[in-house]
């Protein structure tokens, strides 16, 4: 690997390491909630699972929208525009609050929709009990994701990791205390699990905000000044970039929801095997998710500074390293499927043998699945670093719903492949996305490179403007930062 590429890899890994750890901490929180639901019995597990899936689908879209904040902060950081970066974070908090309110109202009143989809009334009752507590996690979750994007985009992801791990540990301790009624605490059941998650989720952004406020390294980023005056232009910019990102997250999540429904049609054993295999895939997938965020921020910094050649190099390094990591996980899925399934299920129990055997066969397909999924996710992040989310949405929509879903249904039912057919269909859609998004990144950078000289000149002008410049400033690839924002 050439020296410039090695520099980019080190920079991406410095960001990706803490972000991967933060993602795994979130997985640990979800796993803890699931285990605690299981302690309450199968009925509570079914109801809690229904509520958790509903919450995850809605919150995933919201997270996608506020993910745009990190993109914009990285671009302005590359342009040495601290005031613009702070303005993006402040506006992101307003967008996150609005999304939390809208999503909360939707989840609070979800009961009629769940009944329309044929869910058992008693299961819906339990799910709503869980959701009525969990809904209050949304404001904190959105605020944390905004602040996480802000601090990571300026190359300070360490506190995100520390607070995420602390949150996961607090979630475990409090959940266990409420479930077991320790220290005189009441046993609150599903409502208690949702309440604990909401409490932890709202404490995490407060801790991160306090850290940002007290650390001298953030002195030039004034997040409080002007927080009460949302900037319409910046809010619109976040939504222009964020809505397609949220849409991409939603259509991908929808594809996996369809896969789960297909497994339910095939049979209970197929559904159980699918859930076990998807958990293994989900844990491994946190690596490319962290790499994707890191690649987005690194490219955004180069893009903001007008360094298009370096942006392309960072994208290629990120995509290549993501594929390599997933190839290693693929090797584990090929060579050690029984051991991996054993982490989730007692394979020796007679009642589990059929499910375990089916899950092992799905992991063999998951090896290809992971390689494609990891590559497409990092490529998606690379394109977003160039402030383009529309391309990722269109490619994702086409590959997930015009290739992945039809192919899964065709192979599972028409071809008679059953559960394996569903997973090969998903792998086909993800392979299409991996190829399409990688080519889209190359096409995008090839179009931008002729403008590199002009971009560099613009970046120099941006720096020359300085903090005291009374006029609006323009960073490459950005809308102008209003003079009021610069004054903040």
UniProtKB/Swiss-Prot annotation:
Signal peptide: none
GO cellular component terms, semicolon-separated: membrane; periplasmic side of plasma membrane; plasma membrane
Stretches that traverse the bilayer: 11-31, 55-75, 97-117, 127-147, 159-179, 190-210, 247-267, 271-291, 317-337, 355-375, 393-413, 421-441
Swiss-Prot/TrEMBL GO biological process terms: monoatomic ion transport
Mode of membrane association: Multi-pass membrane protein
Pfam families: MatE
Coarse class of the protein's main subcellular location: membrane
Protein name per its UniProtKB record: Probable multidrug resistance protein NorM
Gene that specifies this protein: norM
């Amino acid at each position: 690997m050439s020296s410039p590429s090695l520099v980019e890899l080190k920079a991406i890994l410095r960001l990706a390491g803490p972000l991967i750890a933060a993602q795994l901490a979130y997985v640990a929180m979800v796993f803890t909630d699931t285990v605690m639901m299981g302690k309450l019995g199968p009925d509570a597990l079914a109801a809690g699972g229904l509520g958790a899936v509903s919450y995850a689908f809605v919150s995933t879209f919201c997270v996608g929208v506020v993910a745009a904040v990190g993109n914009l902060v990285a671009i302005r950081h590359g342009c040495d525009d601290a005031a613009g970066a702070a303005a993006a974070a402040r506006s992101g908090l307003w967008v996150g609050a609005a999304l939390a309110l809208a999503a909360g109202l939707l989840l609070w009143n979800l009961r009629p929709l769940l009944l329309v989809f044929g869910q058992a009334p008693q299961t819906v009752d339990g799910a709503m009990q869980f959701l009525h507590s969990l809904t209050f996690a949304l404001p904190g979750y959105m605020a944390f994701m905004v602040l996480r994007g802000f601090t990571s985009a300026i190359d300070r992801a360490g506190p995100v990791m520390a607070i995420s791990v602390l949150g996961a540990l607090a979630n475990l301790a409090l959940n266990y205390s409420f479930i077991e009624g320790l220290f005189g605490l009441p046993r609150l059941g599903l409502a208690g699990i949702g309440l604990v998650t909401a409490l932890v989720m709202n404490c995490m952004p407060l801790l991160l905000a306090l850290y940002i406020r007290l650390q001298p390294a953030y002195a030039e980023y004034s997040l409080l000044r002007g927080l009460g005056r949302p900037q319409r232009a910046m809010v619109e910019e976040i939504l222009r970039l964020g809505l397609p990102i949220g849409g991409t997250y939603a259509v991908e999540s929808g594809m996996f929801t369809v896969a789960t429904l297909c497994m339910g049609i095939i049979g209970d054993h197929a559904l159980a095997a699918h859930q076990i295999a998807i958990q293994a895939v989900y844990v491994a997938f946190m690596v490319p998710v962290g790499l994707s965020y890191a690649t987005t921020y690194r490219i955004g910094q180069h893009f903001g500074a007008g360094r298009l050649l370096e942006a392309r190099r960072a994208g290629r390094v990120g995509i290549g390293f993501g594929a390599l990591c997933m190839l290693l996980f693929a090797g584990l899925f090929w060579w050690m499927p029984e051991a991996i399934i054993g982490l989730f299920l007692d394979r020796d129990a007679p009642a589990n043998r059929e499910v375990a055997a089916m899950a092992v066969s799905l992991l063999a397909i998951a090896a290809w699945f992971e390689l494609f999924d990891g590559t497409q996710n990092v490529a998606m992040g690379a394109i977003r670093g160039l402030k383009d989310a529309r391309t990722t949405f269109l490619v994702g929509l086409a590959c997930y719903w015009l290739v992945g879903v039809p192919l899964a249904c065709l192979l599972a039912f028409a071809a008679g492949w059953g559960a394996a057919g569903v997973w090969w269909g998903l792998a086909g859609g993800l392979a299409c996305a991996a190829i399409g998004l990688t080519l889209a990144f190359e096409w995008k950078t090839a179009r931008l490179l002729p403008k590199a000289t002009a971009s560099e000149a613009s970046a120099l002008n941006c720096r020359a403007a300085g903090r005291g410049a009374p006029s609006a400033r323009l960073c490459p690839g950005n809308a102008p930062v209003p003079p009021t924002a610069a004054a903040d």
